[in-house]
């Protein structure tokens, strides 16, 4: 069965008989449901194994005594057995299975300006261009960071006004499920990077408004939308806690808030799974 939904982190010790073993790495909560993250133990190996699912590289963390693959599970994934492919140096390729459990998300009904639901031809063309660009950004894959934690602090203080996975209707019309966490806060509230990162995209988009994408390495990206101000540029390197912008209500928004998204192996997953204990 899926684990408890409490927010906690698994710190898997990798110290052992291997000389020079890395310290424990804090990982996100294991939640093997659509929109969740599955933590798949890969065992020991002197070098980091390569893991893939549907030919997409997966983030592998840990050290020689214990490696773990982090698998982002799409919201549309069916319940049942899923598999990843693993290749360790000096070993035969192997397939590792894990169970995906069903999860039903709540519904959210919103009212926005009609032009933000029934797009004009010009706005539709703009959206299509922006969507193609965003897909390129989401395909970013850089080497995994040598970090001892993936635990994130909330990027902004405030009330969680919208949770991940909500089945949304705008003006009575069904649209895509909510792909992030909404945090309500006053306009101008600083937004900070939850982990060390490189800025890989900034822009002002039709639905997302003023937006920043951060790359944390290994296919782990984070997204910040509806900003009133963007305070970074593409290519900037940020430390955890550095400002990247300020809360706003740009794009399709019903009020000032931050839409915070987490992308893992090109899949939007629940940001709450990455929050440090007590956050």
Locate predicted features.
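Cationic-aromatic interfacial patches
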Residues: 22-96
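Conserved, short, structured surface segments that act as functional micro-motifs
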Residues: 211-216, 236-279
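Zn2+-dependent peptidoglycan hydrolase active-site motif and core
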Residues: 194-228, 256, 261
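N-terminal signal peptide c-region/cleavage motif recognized by signal peptidases
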Residues: 16-19
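Surface-exposed, glycine-biased beta-strand/turn segments
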Residues: 97-208
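Extracytoplasmic
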Residues: 35-37, 64-66, 79, 93-95, ...
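Short, well-structured beta-strand-loop connectors
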Residues: 190-200, 231-247
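N-terminal secretory signal peptides and thylakoid transit peptides that target proteins
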Residues: 1-14
